[in-house]
Amino acid sequence: MTFRVATNDDIPGLNGLVNSAYRGEGSKQGWTTEADLLDGIRTSEDSLREMIERLDAVIVLAEQDNEMKGCVYLEKQADALYLGMLTVRPNLQGKGLGTQLLHAAEERAKEIGCQKIRMTVITVREELIAYYKRKGYKDTGERKPFPNDPKFGIPKRELEFLVMEKEIR
């Protein structure tokens, strides 16, 4: 597995990868699907382009045999590195790639001088929260509303985020 920073040339493949892992029937092959919580798409080519072109952010791609297997969005914020859109192909979930992507995020945090990583997780995703806790992330107690914007998906029920953090040494 190799890791690199995504470019605009990767946008079509990234769009397919992320949406297949989070939404729709294909996402149900993995354990991280949001298909029962949200309709619509997880991201779009325009959103990915905005992420890639930000000066304070990167999308790290995991590839094997020239095929995208996973990715993670990392954005430097005032006091932390924000981690989002952690994605692993549904048929590869549970095989350690998510852990490798988290490790890549921690290395990036160290490189740019961030002492913690912050993320948001939908509160009803108990299995995902438990996964992140096993990886050293803690519930900060902070909650945020789920955005009322179809570009993030259309909630099938009331949703909110919890904020999790991990200290990086």
Label every PLM stretch briefly.
Residues R49, Q115-R118, I122-I129, K135-R169:
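C-terminal "cap" of GNAT-fold acetyltransferases
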Residues T43-V60, Y82, R157:
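A short helix-loop-beta-strand connector motif used in the catalytic cores of GNAT acetyltransferases and
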Residues V88, G94-E107, R134:
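Conserved acetyl-CoA-binding loop-helix of GNAT-fold acetyltransferases
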Residues L61, E67-E75, Y82-T87:
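Conserved beta-strand in the GNAT
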Residues T2-G16, G24:
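A short beta-loop-alpha structural element at the N-terminal edge
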Residues N19-L48:
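Conserved GNAT-fold acetyl-CoA-binding loop/helix
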